Swiss-Prot record:
It comes from the Eukaryota. Keywords: Coiled coil, Cytoplasm, Repeat, SH3 domain. It comes from Homo sapiens (Human). This is MAGUK p55 subfamily member 4. Residues 154-235 form the PDZ domain. Residues 568-621 form a coiled coil. Residues 1-22 are annotated as: Disordered. Pfam families: Guanylate_kin, L27, PDZ.
């Protein structure tokens, strides 16, 4: 970068003159001179960019460019013409004459100079320029070319261990073998010599007339090194003028299981949550995409948004009818399964170490919270228990039914962009998620206790009566049932449920209160509530807490206990741990596309360190977020 000293003295008058052989009538140089003269009046003053611009115009490399420009302009204005366009022939004639002349040192030196290779090359270049012989002369076309004969093009490609990057098909009417598509990033696309629609005539000297596409593919597969194609070029080559788009896969796709894919080998498999770069959307049914995790490879075929949504819809309607399917999530269980799933339906939170094993009665626990040095909101037994039962609430079901049904056949791709939080922006909401007993609540507690001035939970809402030692806005926001239900119907409640006849929940406004204070809001959610949180105003970063293997879970939870409606201090059983692992797999299978980060809770200390690191990256490093979040922010400004 060119820098200048603002305190420097103005340049001398002689320095303002450009050191070039510039013609005064030259427009560009004259303008630059005038600019330098004007800038010299402001040089050294506190004017942004003046010194930098002056130094730029006065730099040696720009002066050298101006010299070259002036020389070219001078040559152009003189309109010089060569003395002869046949200087090389004239040189040969001079050499022949010198041979007949009596020998002398001068004549011998002249003869050696004219016969020197460099001088001959100089004269050859002179004659080429003088004769304007810049392109090779093609032989004239013969007069007896049949009008019906198509123009041919010979294409040679050197194939190493890389795929050719093209697919072929047979024309239904003519039976010709055509190039169906050119895969982005493949050998054929990089060469720029083959286009979709080109007709193959020969491959390595073998005519493809009458062959099936599979036979042509076999010829290509057996070829090594150089592959020679003889093709009839398409009259109007397709041009991909579309802008590249990045999407998050909201479903999974396996080309090997799709009978409709045009070329299985060219298919690109992906899983939920993968970020794809869509490089070609010219085909209405099959797009070309690549994973950003592997940008070096060529693109592959994926179903278009319309086609994949249609496949999802066909699969959805082909399933056996299940009444009230929209009310169920992967966490829901039938009444017959209730006794076998204590850890899921009846458990409050069974976390590591001694947190849950020292669980007090509800009244005593809340009173202890009042006497703490700092108060942590949102850790009430009733709040956690009602959240586990929220899917049984008729109110919850009536509001969420439509969204749940829609999400089952929702958009298979979600357009995303890179988002970098600016220092002036509010922090992103941190959402923790995981099966019961994995340690979500304890991780959140330790995170807030680690730095309560930086991390905070949102204060929940409740319809129960405030107790004598409680304060409105500290333990809970105490509201009427009518107010609570209005918040639900206006979609201002992120989560809610009912416990002992009272409603509990966390509102958007409660989260915003924490964010406006310049703190990071940390909350834990059930997976079925995640859609309501994914808004542009909160920009949540979802972290999934995953249990470790059975051996590690037995060791870390040997002293932990499960708190249920029916038992107190019930030890973890192997079936409880197995159910926790199974539940985590189901959550990851159904909701994994919403997870921004996954932490395996092998030990509470390591998991907490990983959580801190993940939160820091979420707030400070670029992340993929839905494009609607950014467009909504732009419209609101």
């Amino acid at each position: 970068m060119i820098q200048s000293d603002k305190g420097a003295d103005p340049p001398d008058k002689k320095d303002m003159k450009l050191s070039t052989a510039t013609n005064p009538q030259n427009g560009l140089s004259q303008i630059l001179r005038l600019v330098l003269q004007e800038l010299s009046l402001f040089y050294g003053r506190d004017v942004n960019g003046v010194c930098l611009l002056y130094d730029l115009l006065h730099s040696p490399w720009l002066q050298a460019l101006l010299k070259i420009y002036d020389c070219l302009q001078e040559f152009k204005e003189k309109k010089l013409v060569p003395a002869t366009p046949h200087a090389q022939v004239l040189s040969y004639e001079v050499v022949e004459l010198l041979r007949e002349t009596p020998t002398s040192p001068e004549i011998q030196e002249l003869r050696q100079m004219l016969q020197a290779p460099h001088f001959k090359a100089l004269l050859s270049a002179h004659d080429t320029i003088a004769q304007k012989d810049f392109e090779p002369l093609l032989p004239p076309l013969p007069d007896n070319i049949p009008e019906s004969e198509e123009a041919m093009r010979i294409v040679c490609l050197v194939k190493n261990q890389q795929p050719l990057g093209a697919t072929i098909k047979r024309h239904e009417m003519t039976g010709d073998i055509l190039v169906a598509r050119i895969i982005h990033g493949g050998l054929a696309e990089r060469s720029g010599l083959l286009y979709a629609g080109d007709k193959l005539v020969e491959v390595n000297g073998v005519s493809v007339e009458g062959l099936d596409p599979e036979q042509v593919i076999h010829i290509l597969a057996m070829s090594r090194g150089t592959i020679m194609f003889k093709v009839v070029p398409v009259s109007d080559p397709p041009v991909n003028s579309q802008q590249m788009v990045y999407v998050r896969a909201m479903t999974e796709y396996w080309p090997q299981e799709d009978p409709d894919i045009p070329c299985m080998d060219a298919g690109l498999p992906f899983q939920k949550g993968d970020i794809l770069q869509i490089v070609d959307q010219n085909d209405a049914l099959w797009w070309q995409a690549r994973k950003i995790s592997d940008p070096a490879t060529c693109a592959g075929l994926v179903p278009s948004n319309h086609l994949l949504k249609r496949k999802q819809r066909e699969f959805w309607w082909s399933q056996p009818y299940q009444p009230h399917t929209c009310l169920k999530s992967t966490l829901s269980i039938s009444m017959e399964e209730e006794d076998d799933m204590k850890i899921d339906e009846k458990c409050v939170e069974a976390d590591e170490e001694t947190f849950e094993s020292e669980e007090l009665s509800e009244d005593k626990e809340e009173f202890v919270g009042y006497g703490q040095k700092f108060f942590i909101a949102g850790f009430r037994r009733s709040m956690r228990l009602c959240r586990r039962k929220s899917h049984l609430s008729p109110l919850h079901a009536s509001v969420c039914c439509t969204g749940s049904c829609y999400s089952a056949v929702g958009a298979p791709y979600e357009e995303v962009v890179r988002y970098q939080r600016r220092p002036s922006d509010k922090y992103r909401l941190i959402v923790l998620m995981g099966p019961s007993g994995v340690g979500v609540n304890e991780l959140r507690r330790q995170l807030i206790e680690f730095n309560p001035s930086h991390f905070q939970s949102a204060v929940p809402h409740t319809t129960r009566t405030k107790k004598s030692y409680e304060m409105n806005g500290r333990e809970y926001h105490y509201v009427s049932k009518e107010t609570f239900e209005n918040l639900i119907y206006s979609h201002r409640m992120l989560e809610y449920g009912e416990y002992k006849g009272h409603l509990y929940g966390t509102s958007v406004d409660a989260v915003q209160t924490v964010l406006v204070e310049g703190k990071i809001c940390v909350m834990d959610l059930e997976p079925q509530d995640i859609q309501g949180v994914r808004t542009h105003e909160l920009k949540p970063y979802v972290i999934f807490i995953k249990p470790s293997n059975m051996r590690c879970m037995k060791q870390s939870r040997k002293n932990a206990k499960v708190i249920t409606d029916y038992y107190v201090d019930m030890k973890f059983k192997d079936e409880d741990l197995q159910e926790m692992e199974n539940l985590a797999q189901r959550m990851e299978t159904q909701f994994g596309q919403f997870f921004d980060h996954v932490i395996v809770n092998d030990s509470l200390h390591d998991a907490c360190a990983q959580l801190l690191s993940a939160i820091q990256k979420a707030q400070e490093e670029p992340q993929w977020v839905p494009a609607t979040w950014i467009s909504s922010d732009t419209e609101s400004q």
